[in-house]
Amino acid sequence: MMIIGIDPGLEFTGWGVVSSTNSQSVCLLDSGVISTRGISRESEKLYKIYVSLLSVLSLYKIDEASIEKVFINSNPRSSMSLCYARAASTISVMSRGIDIYEYSSTAIKKCITGNGMAPKEQVSFMVRSSLGIKQDVEINNHSSDAIAAALCHVYNTRNRNFALK
């Protein structure tokens, strides 16, 4: 099963594609960041996120997607921007007929690290450890968070399938 994880953001949208086999192994196939820095119009940023994710989705036979839920913070403007980026990401995935699953950042962190309030560095460390990614391989926080979302879905799917047996 191939899963794409998405960490939406208006400036930086992280993505990570993992493959999970029946033998319980998971491997990272690819990851990256869609940057909209230098683009001033919000509509153009959203379009770039949409088109760039479509491009990534065309490279792999993705079975399911996992995306971080939006949390509402004290700054309404940044919350709205995050909602827009999430919508552009969701539409990209849904337009390919791929089921998308949503997890809160707390649920993702708890699943990956055991601590729902874990700092980004701890999430990144556990992502690297879980997938055997060497320290010299560059993965930024946006990609790491997206990979964590994908791993969270893999682990939750395994638990659901185990419970059904």
UniProtKB/Swiss-Prot annotation:
Pfam (any one): RuvC
InterPro entries referenced in this protein's UniProt entry, alphabetically: RNaseH-like_sf (IPR012337), RNaseH_sf (IPR036397), X-over_junc_endoDNase_RuvC (IPR002176)
Cofactor note: Binds 2 Mg(2+) ion per subunit.
GO cellular component terms given for this protein: cytoplasm; Holliday junction resolvase complex
Subcellular location: Cytoplasm
Keywords carried by this UniProt record: Cytoplasm, DNA damage, DNA recombination, DNA repair, DNA-binding, Endonuclease, Hydrolase, Magnesium, Metal-binding, Nuclease
Leading EC class: hydrolase
E.C. number: 3.1.21.10
Binding site for Mg(2+) 1: 7, 142
Main localization, broad class: cytoplasm
Active site residues according to the UniProt entry: 7, 68, 142
Essential cofactor(s): Mg(2+)
Example GO molecular function: magnesium ion binding
Reactions catalysed, as given in the entry: Endonucleolytic cleavage at a junction such as a reciprocal single-stranded crossover between two homologous DNA duplexes (Holliday junction)
Coiled coil: none
DNA repair recorded as keyword: yes
Binding-site list for Mg(2+) 2: 68
GO BP terms in the entry: DNA recombination; DNA repair
HAMAP family: RuvC (MF_00034)
Quaternary structure annotation from Swiss-Prot or TrEMBL: Homodimer which binds Holliday junction (HJ) DNA. The HJ becomes 2-fold symmetrical on binding to RuvC with unstacked arms; it has a different conformation from HJ DNA in complex with RuvA. In the full resolvosome a probable DNA-RuvA(4)-RuvB(12)-RuvC(2) complex forms which resolves the HJ.
Task of the protein: The RuvA-RuvB-RuvC complex processes Holliday junction (HJ) DNA during genetic recombination and DNA repair. Endonuclease that resolves HJ intermediates. Cleaves cruciform DNA by making single-stranded nicks across the HJ at symmetrical positions within the homologous arms, yielding a 5'-phosphate and a 3'-hydroxyl group; requires a central core of homology in the junction. The consensus cleavage sequence is 5'-(A/T)TT(C/G)-3'. Cleavage occurs on the 3'-side of the TT dinucleotide at the point of strand exchange.
Similarity comment text for this entry: Belongs to the RuvC family.
Name used for this protein in its record: Crossover junction endodeoxyribonuclease RuvC
Source species of the chain: Anaplasma marginale (strain St. Maries)
